[in-house]
Amino acid sequence: MTKQYERKAKGGNLLSAFELYQRNTDNMPGLGEMLVDEWFETCRDYIQDGHVDESGTFRPDNAFYLRRLTLKDFRRFSLLEIKFEEDLTVIIGNNGKGKTSILYAIAKTLSWFVANILKEGGSGQRLSELTDIKNDAENRYADVSSTFFFGKGLKSVPIRLSRSALGTAERRDSEVKPARDLADIWRVINEAKTINLPTFALYNVERSQPFNRNTKDNAGRREERFDAYSQALGGAGRFDHFVEWYIYLHKRTISDISSSIKELEQQVNDLQRSVDGGMVSVKSLLEQMKLKLSEASERNDAAVSSKMVTESVQKSIVEKSICSVVPSISKIWVEMTTGSDLVKVTNDGHDVTIDQLSDGQRVFLSLVADLARRMVMLNPLLENPLEGRGIVLIDEIELHLHPKWQQEVILNLRSVFPNIQFIITTHSPIVLSTIEKRCIREFDPNDDGNQSFLDSPDMQTKGSENAQILEQVMNVHPTPPGIAESHWLGDFELLLLDNSGELDNQSQELYDKIKTHFGIDSAELKKADSLIRINKMKNKINKIRAEKGK
């Protein structure tokens, strides 16, 4: 069996290499130090290795991403199958089609990776027999089946979450061992020697909840690396969470020397006053305390300097990501001169407090900042931690965003977080106009939920006009059919055809209505004038042909 593992490991199989590392570590502590090191480095290199592409961006040699999802009797779906792109997948469909349910199915699956990175045998989110099983499910259970890809040495990581309905005699267990096996590798290798870890996050529409800042002082709280996974898949990205964390980080980077040094300073000051008051007997003690204070300060400066650099860089990266992605913001900082902690930004050249930003800016800022914070904590070995890998789910990416910002949102996210697999939902044709059709997954408009296969649209969306995308991809007419004014131009064209291109009283009246309603510089009036010219030209040509035929 060992030979078989060795053959697979040398062929690039990650699970086999890790099995050999574990065997040599657990069962042959004396023998296999070299073997242990060999298989450990094989695993670590598989996870860590990467290259810099032509644009100067770090790319992992072994990408990790969700490849396929199948839902069976999950919520509204009898059966749904969807394939994902490695970099970006955008899901579109009418309200109630189940876009958000797809994101929650993925989030529940990802939670099993997170739970087992944090501790051996951890349990992730389970399906609910109350809310996740289709009401009329024939088999009385729900399945969420996922397949992940992690490089050529681990092409398929299949996971299935299952749940039987209440009162069902037969139990249906989930199959999560592959998730635990992979998470074990990340956890064990990281424990032996720090590695970069994947980021997983869900940003749901609740991120738009009103700003409710907690004003208590959190400067003394302790920030651990694995806090990056805290609440990551529960709809992260609340604005008040970011403000609290950012003020904490700011205070950490400018914090005073430790309390022990403050005590030494107080003792030195007290002794100095005694000596100055004539107590010569404590002069030698004063010199000893001064020396102790000097040595303690030097040690503290060295330790604090190292930690402050880390936190200072962390803060700088988050600030840079915000200014790169969030529209109109060029600077962000903490203002403390007023006696209270205020996060301020330069917005379109004006300094304002962060709670004075628009809803769209606040919502998007908190998402970007939250994601950047998590990636900085999980990727300490990367020169740019935002080039770490991971899977990020965003519901309604266009939430509160101005149309101009919708044109930039995905482009900016992909630029700042180049190795994240984004899985996104949207209702915005503007967003769709910025991405290739290969990245879009649409529901069949006639789908009744019994059997769904999400696929790419026929039309190329990137660079296309919004009106085309609305009509050909989203099956929505660019102008509302229930609005009478939207039909005037078509009615006008029909009148011209009926009257051989001439304006009679009825067509003239309709022309005047178009001119008055839409305005003299409107595209609608220009189209009406163009129709008149074209029909006059056709009429003239027809007359010439008629005369030649006599």
Swiss-Prot record:
Spell out the SUPFAM superfamilies in the cross-references. Answer: P-loop containing nucleoside triphosphate hydrolases
Q: Which biological process terms from the Gene Ontology are attached to this UniProt entry?
A: defense response to virus; DNA synthesis involved in DNA repair; double-strand break repair
Q: Which Pfam families match?
A: AAA_21
Q: Which GO terms describe its molecular function?
A: ATP binding; ATP hydrolysis activity
**Residues spanned by motif ATP-binding:** 93-100
Source taxon at top rank: Bacteria
Is Nucleotide-binding a UniProt keyword of this protein? yes
Q: Which InterPro entries match?
A: ATPase_AAA_core, P-loop_NTPase, Retron_ATPase
Which UniProt keyword terms apply here?
A: Antiviral defense, ATP-binding, Nucleotide-binding
- Stated role: Probable ATPase component of antiviral defense system retron Ec78, composed of a non-coding RNA (ncRNA), a reverse transcriptase (RT), this protein and a putative HNH endonuclease. Expression of retron Ec78 confers protection against bacteriophage T5. At multiplicity of infection (MOI) of 0.02 cultures slow growth when infected with T5 but do not collapse, at MOI 2 cultures enter growth stasis.
Q: NCBIfam families recorded for this chain? A: PtuA (NF041760)
Identification of the protein by name: Retron Ec78 probable ATPase
Q: Which organism is it from?
A: Escherichia coli
